[in-house]
Each structure stands twice: as C-alpha cells, then as structure tokens.
Amino acid sequence: MVKNSYPSRRQAKKQTNWFLVISGVLTAILLVTAGLYSVFGVSRTVQQTNGSSVTKSSKQATDATQSKDAKGLPDVSPKDWQLLLVNRDNKSKELNPEIADVDGVSVDARIAKNVKEFLAAAQEIDPSYHLISGYRSVAYQTELYNSYVQQEMAADPSLTESQAEKKVQTYSQPPGASEHQTGLAIDMSTVDSLNEADPDTVAKVKELAPKYGFVLRFPDGKTSSTGVGYEDWHFRYVGKESAEYMTEHNLTLEEYLALLKEKSK
C-alpha cells in the first residue's frame, strides 16, 4: 500500500514549481546522508570504544590473575635448602647432610621431628604404615641401582644393559639423580612392594602430608614433569607453606620451582 501511494501524490502536485521540488529533494538527501553518517559513525565509534574497553578489561583481568598468583606464592626462595632439586637433569655430588635416625631410617636432622610426626599421623590412619627408606649416599645408590639392573637382566635375558637401565629408571634413579641423597625424601608405606598400598589410604595420607611439610613427590599423571612414574610411597619434605601451596595447586617440585624463579625475575 505504501508503495502505490507515491504516484497518486505526485499526480496531485503536477503544478508544483520544479525548482522547489528539486531543492527539497536535495535537502532531503543531505539530511538522510547526515543521519546515516551519524548513526553508523557513532556505531563504529561505539564498537571501537567497546572493543578497546573489552581488550583493556581482558588485559586487566589477566594481569590481576597473574598478580594474584604471584601474591599467593609463599615467601620462599628457590634456593632454600628444603627446595633443593635433584633429578636426572639436576644431578648432584655427595651432599653429606647431618643425619638423624627416625624409626631405624636416616633423614636430614633438620626434618627428623617432621618425619616422626608425619609417620605417627599416617599410623593413625593405618597402623601398618612404616618407613622403608630415607637418606642414601651416592655410593649406596650406585650399588642399589646396579643391583636393580642386574635383576632386570636376570629376569629377562633378552635385555641389554641399556634396556635394563631404562626399565629400572621407571622406579629408581641413577647415582647422583636420586633425591634420597638429600636426606629430605622418605619412602613410607603399608607394604614394601611398589604401588600396592590401598589407594584410599594413600589419598588420606597425601592429604595430611602438607601439615608436616611433605608432598607426594611423584604423583599420578605428572611423569612429563618429574620424569618418574607414579610412586605412592615416596614423600618429599619441602616445608609447610610450600607443601600446602603445591598440594592445593597440584604442582610438582619442578613446576613449583619454575613459578618461584619466574616470580623472582
């Protein structure tokens, strides 16, 4: 209907001054053009402004998150003695720590009290929990490692020494690469076999470990970070603050130290 009404209106105004008509049309065109520019120009400006605002907000949120993470990290240094990193990429010579005896196992004297309390707490969960191993000298680790290699070759004569070593390294470290030589690591379990403790019991002990400054050193799913498969018996002392932070954020010692080093830059 709207489309058909225009011809009738023009016919009714045949006597109109064409100069006035043309002038009116030009004026209307100018007004429409100005209006369109105003609408779309403002729209583009709003979009650009909003885009800048979103980008700025996103950056601020990222910065805030990074700041929050940095602030959340304990006030410790990656060079602190309790955070000493020993692994295949960070081998160490004999460290000769001052050791103390806890339930027949040697540990760094500085953590003896923590080990006693942690063991007692674990035994409240399951009385069969006991210490299996603590401090080992590099010389002893050499003997242990070589004995494992020989055992693997005896069990499977087709293995070369190199192949046997690779197999052993899934559960034992080469001399100089074992953190047992720090005196800060303990093997503690309800059994003496590998990964055969009750998973629910291990989970409970893992949960209370930070209270005494310990973390499960080689958790499940973190082999790419630690280079070692899951070990339900191997606990490492890192200090209470660090242990709580690492456990809360599911961090290995390698990942935690990387954050601390980034923070200190």
Regions found by a protein language model. Give the residues of each.
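Extracytoplasmic cell-surface/polysaccharide-interacting catalytic and binding patches
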Residues: 2-265
